[in-house]
Design a protein with these regions (language model features):
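Active-site-adjacent, His/Asp/Glu-enriched structural segments that form or flank metal-binding
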Residues: 89-158
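A mature extracytoplasmic/lumenal domain signature
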Residues: 47-49, 58-60, 72, 90-96, ...
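Extracytoplasmic/secreted cell-surface and envelope-processing proteins
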Residues: 53-54, 117-121, 149-152, 252, ...
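A small/polar active-site loop signature that marks catalytic segments
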Residues: 135-136, 146, 156-310
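Short, well-structured active-site flanking segments
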Residues: 78-93, 299-304
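Extracytoplasmic
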Residues: 38-40, 48, 57-59, 65-68, ...
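Beta-lactamase-like hydrolase cores
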Residues: 2-61, 124-131
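Active-site SXXK
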Residues: 50, 64-82, 140, 230
Length: 314
């Protein structure tokens, strides 16, 4: 047999592009003009005063992948502000016996905080304990828009919430999340007992009845911290949920177009995370970055506050 591979007459994968440069580079720096950029690659580098350092096919549209999250971050901060917090309401239709620590009735949870996670369920249990409540004779009920632990299935989220509320049902993952939360928030030593609330009823997805009374509201971290976490981990789930708060990818596109002046034919999104077929030109992305930087300054923030910084963030 021949030692030289022979190409198949009908290859499974066929090249559709070329690694050869298809255009010359526009640059204010002579040595950069000699750089051969392969294929159809869009590049635009500008100095802070707006001078072009390097440019190549910057008006063509490309799939920006996770750079879409920059647009989503801009849109949610522009709409809600950096200090916005998602509320999660805790309600009841029952009565409380302080001598036994028993709540006779149901507990209802409302809210659609996309960052609501395992440790936040334990935090609600801790707050119920602070009110003296340690057992509930009724059901645990969540509304149909309740989100927990990156699950949009409300029934699954409700079951996860019940497991995080009751110390007897918690697994090692929930306990680890709670301990990490105490450590990172500087609250180690402030919670003397293990938070726990037991339920004798079931777990359901229903609306909150009109006779229910609010016990308290749990608030998320500020929007700027949620955006920072989303960007550091390039979290597709968080990015999609934040985009949903605005009306989806189309709404994110419109907010960017209206506030930056980029034309619709150079900036259109199918998703809020970067998954799927999105199309953005380097020129449009540069306009977004400039406007975003300016708006962050008005919020007394910089890109460091909402994007990962190498060697500093983990």
């Amino acid at each position: 047999p021949s030692a030289t591979p022979i190409p198949a007459t009908t290859p499974t994968v066929k090249p559709i592009g070329s690694s050869s440069a298809v255009s010359t580079v526009n640059s204010s720096i002579p040595v950069l003009r000699e750089v051969a950029i392969p294929g159809y690659s869009g590049i635009l580098v500008e100095s802070l005063d707006g001078k072009i350092v390097m440019e190549n096919l910057s008006s063509l549209n490309y799939n920006p992948a996770s750079n879409v999250k920059i647009a989503t971050s801009y849109a949610v901060l522009k709409t809600f502000g950096p200090e916005f917090r998602f509320p999660t309401g805790v309600w009841t239709d029952g009565s409380f016996d302080p001598t036994s620590g028993t709540l006779y009735g149901n507990v209802y949870i409302s809210g659609k905080d996309p960052s609501f996670n395992l440790e936040h369920g334990v935090s609600i249990s801790n707050e119920l304990n602070r009110l003296g409540i340690r057992s509930v004779t009724g059901d645990l009920v969540v509304t149909d828009n309740f989100i927990m632990n990156y699950s949009t299935n409300p029934q699954r989220a409700a079951a996860t919430l019940q497991a995080s509320l009751d110390a007897g049902k918690r697994n090692a993952t929930i306990n680890k999340s709670w301990q990490s939360y105490l450590l990172n928030s500087g609250k180690v030593g402030q919670v003397s007992n293990v938070p726990s609330v037991s339920f004798t009823g079931g777990v359901y997805v229903q609306q909150i009845p009109s006779n229910a009374k609010m016990l308290f509201t749990h608030e998320s971290a500020p929007m700027k911290e949620i955006v920072k976490a989303m960007m550091c981990y390039s979290n597709n789930y968080l990015s999609e949920r934040l985009g949903d708060m605005l009306g989806g990818a189309f709404a994110v596109s419109r907010i960017v177009q209206q506030n930056t002046g980029v034309p619709a034919n150079e900036f259109y999104l199918a998703t809020s995370s970067g998954l799927g077929m999105n199309r953005v030109s380097p020129r449009a992305m540069m306009k977004l970055l400039k406007v975003f930087r300016n708006d962050l300054g008005k919020m007394k923030m910089t890109f460091n506050d909402i994007m990962p910084v190498a060697g500093m963030d983990k």
